[in-house]
Each structure stands twice: as structure tokens, then as C-alpha cells.
Amino acid sequence: TCSYCKIVGTIRLQKYLYGSDHQLGFKQISSCAHAIYVVRKTVEYYVSNDSTVNICTLDISKAFDKFNNHCLLLKLMKRRLPVNFVVLFQRWLCNVFIKVRWGSCLSKLFRLFSGVRQGGILSPVFFCIYIDDLINKISHLDTGCFIRGFFSAIWLYADDIVLLSATVSGLQHMINACVQELDYLDLSVNILKSRCMRVGRRFKSIGTRVVINGSPIDWCDELGYIGMIFKSSTVFM
């Protein structure tokens, strides 16, 4: 299996194995600093034009453990990946067997039907492809933040999602689309770890609830995103 990954990794498949520019994780030339930078610049652009930005971070429950291999294969086929590689990936992904050790006891061998391999050479690429339609769906809503026509309403760092909108209604629209698309992917949002916050002149004016399946997301004075803490204020802090 490892040999397969190394061989495939040397073949030029960028035409098929790519992710959105709005996914800043798993890339050699990007880091957490880039993710923070694009959020900061988007918020500062709107605040400088006397707007208030609504920020929402969504936490995906066990995103890597619930990774649906068959869904990934369908996405690869939609990209017209050559059939020999589809078959190769199908055999590689769907024939994973493990044992569990508990103390001195070892379980019987059993098959895994979901999950992406931690540390696998192609695992980051597969996850980017798997989540790519979520970004595409949000980008086609024509809502959220734009900077002179450039779409800047959703950014991901691996499985960490941040949504940016100048209106609460626009934010809710994007959240609904995210929840729907994640449901298609056999994933769900952990509402207890998801947060909303406002930055701008009217940061204290919160009149509308933001919900996921009827349950409200908390509006907070502070919001954590990939190791950084943002504060609700008149300016981005």
C-alpha cells in the first residue's frame, strides 16, 4: 500500500488530484499564518468601509474518522480520473484491515469502511478533494464577503471552516448550505464547538439568532480559530 502511494505520488495527476484555493491546509506554500491573514484582510476591508462583519467558525465532528471512501471514489470519477487509477484507489481504500490492542489482548482482524489514513502520503490530497464541493457550493451562493469582486466568504484550513458575511442573513444562508453539503458527505457540524462573532462599528448589535437545524450557535466575545483568538470589537484583534 505504501509503495502504491509513493508510485502514484511521482505520477503527474495534478489535473485530477487538486483542491480549491480556499483550502489553505495541506499545501507546501501555505500555513496557519496565511489562513489568519486572509480572514484579517477581509474583515479589515469591510470595517474600513464602515461595515460590520459576521464571523462563524464551524467544527466538523470527526471529519477524518468519518471520511467516506465510496464518496471519494465518486468524486474522482466525476473528475474523469483514468479508470486504472480509480480501481487502484478503490482497492487501496476499501481493503483496510486492522486489529485493536487492549493491554495484552489483541482483537480479531476486521475491516475499516471509513476514515482517512493518518500520515498517509495521499491522505491530505484525498481530504481536499472530498471537501472541495463544500467550497464550490458556498461560492455559487453569491453571498458573504467579497473584496472588489474576489470571493472571500469561506476559508478552510484542513477541516477548520470560517465563514465571513456582512449580513446575518447571508451568514445563515451559508451555514445552511454547509450543513446540507456536509450531510451529503456523511459529516456533521458540532454545534457545541461552533461559534459566531461580530467585528466592526456595530459589533454589539446582535438581533438575529444563527441556527443549525433549529439549535442556536452562540455569539461570543472571543472566537478561536486554528490556535488564534479573535476578539469582538470595532476592529480586528
Regions found by a protein language model. Name each.
Residues 189-221:
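Short, conserved micro-motifs composed of acidic
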Residues 48-50, 153-156, 221-222:
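Short, flexible turn/loop "capping" segments at secondary-structure junctions
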Residues 1-129:
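Conserved pre-catalytic core of RNA-dependent polymerases
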